[in-house]
Amino acid sequence: KLDLAKNRMYCNYAFYFGATADNSIDLASLNNLDGCCGIKLFAGSSTGNLLVAEEEDIDKVFQNSSKVVAVHSEDESILNLNKKLIKKGDVNSHPIWRSVECAISSTRRIVKIAERYNKKAHILHITTKEEIDFLSQHKGNITFEITPQHLTLFAPDCYLKLGTYAQMNPPIRDKTHYDRLWYAVRNNFNDTIGSDHAPHLKINKDKEYPASPSGMPGVQTLMPVMLNHVNDGKLSLSQLIKFVCENPVKIFGIKNKGFIKEVLMLTLQLLI
């Protein structure tokens, strides 16, 4: 991955080491691996083929982890049970399949395991009010992210207007969850705002649901979208700086970045 990125990315970058059910022993020796910012664990199946669904295997990942474990938190058993709720051609059924219970069940399990071993877990793209309320009571080694898309869109409007272009995992939910996400941002409950960058070809996103892939672009849109929210008074510029610059370097142990200080390497984003 580092070779592929070289001379193609005009920004600072690092990659996750993907956890599987079979490589937990390898996770203990990642501290000095160049270009590795953390471990990625898919507790529920999503885009790609990485999946660590069994609690015993998740336990081994955290037990052996030498870096922060970033988690796609959905309960695979509930996803499988709920497949009968998928309605062909109706993307409105996406958040019914990938339900609130699916998200909070997984997140509770991840936090329980991480706290058992006193290991760091970063829960990615939180979408439910239940997770916000739960995670706000479990800080310290537990951090979490919210995405711009979940702070900008809500169901059912997004599916009526955008169809499968609004399809992602975990899904965009109704306004009660949207409002709770913003409550978290205003009160600094979340630690980061991340892109969950997952673009697809238009020809694939136009396929009939559920054959359409989940995900949307995010790297190039995160700052414009969030700055628009700053201009609308939904959060302050200083909050945004903490969510996208200062807190990520603390969580992932990135040296000499994230702050404007005399002794640090200066990285600026120009806003025009």
PLM features: residue spans?
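Short helix-capping segments at alpha-helix termini
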Residues: 5-11, 116-117, 139-141, 232-235
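Metal-cofactor-binding active-site regions of metalloenzymes
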Residues: 4-25, 42-47
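His/Asp/Glu-enriched, well-ordered alpha-helical/loop segment
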Residues: 91-118, 187-193, 198-271
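Residues embedded in well-ordered beta-strands within globular domains across many folds
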Residues: 14-17, 40, 194, 270
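Histidine/acidic residue-rich metal-binding segments in metalloenzymes
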Residues: 25-41, 48-193
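Alpha-helix-loop-beta-strand connector modules within alpha/beta enzyme cores
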Residues: 1-11, 58-71, 220-225
